[in-house]
A protein has these predicted regions:
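Bacterial N-terminal signal peptides that target proteins for export
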Residues: 1-6
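Bacterial N-terminal signal peptides
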Residues: 7-17
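Bacterial Sec-dependent signal peptides at the C-terminal "C-region" and cleavage site
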Residues: 16-24
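Extracellular/periplasmic metallocenter environments
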Residues: 23-42, 82-121
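Surface-exposed, proline-enriched loop/turn segments that connect beta strands in immunoglobulin-like
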Residues: 43-46, 77
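Beta-strand cores of secreted/periplasmic/IMS beta-sandwich domains, seen most often
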Residues: 47-66, 89-103
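Short, surface-exposed beta-strand/strand-loop-strand elements in extracellular ectodomains
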Residues: 68-75
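Solvent-exposed serine/threonine-rich low-complexity stretches and specific carbohydrate-binding patches
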Residues: 75-83
């Protein structure tokens, strides 16, 4: 009875994508905030519009003390401080749903994306 369970667990682990170091690959997104713009891009440099449910490494580059980066969505509510220039790295699981990112000081600086589909196998 234990053998089939162990075999299934081993297959699940082997099915995970891995990098050269042998650890699972975590997709990276980069958020950048300046005094006049806010963006969220994928590894390809293109603005994020649709993502699969997954764990993402989000590097937030807050380049101004005048704005901040605030990400809101299902079970997500993370932000940088307004009065600080900073670079932060967040490891977040993004589940299906609608997400928005904005500056709390200037609502005109905003963007949105959706997470849809099935998590990667």
């Amino acid at each position: 009875m234990l053998r089939p369970l162990l075999a299934a667990a081993l297959l699940a682990v082997l099915a995970l994508p891995v990098g050269a170091s042998g650890s699972p690959i975590v997709p990276q997104l980069t958020a950048t905030v300046t005094a006049k713009s806010i963006t969220l891009v994928g590894a390809d440099g293109k603005r994020v519009r649709v993502l699969q449910p997954n764990t993402y490494k989000i590097v937030v580059r807050d380049r101004t003390k005048a704005q901040n980066f605030h990400l809101v969505g299902p079970r997500v509510n993370r932000k940088t401080k307004i009065a600080a220039k900073t670079t932060r790295t967040w490891l977040l699981y993004l589940q299906p749903g609608s997400y928005s990112y904005l500056s709390d000081r200037n609502k005109g600086l905003s963007g949105a994306f959706i997470v849809a589909g099935s998590p990667p196998a």
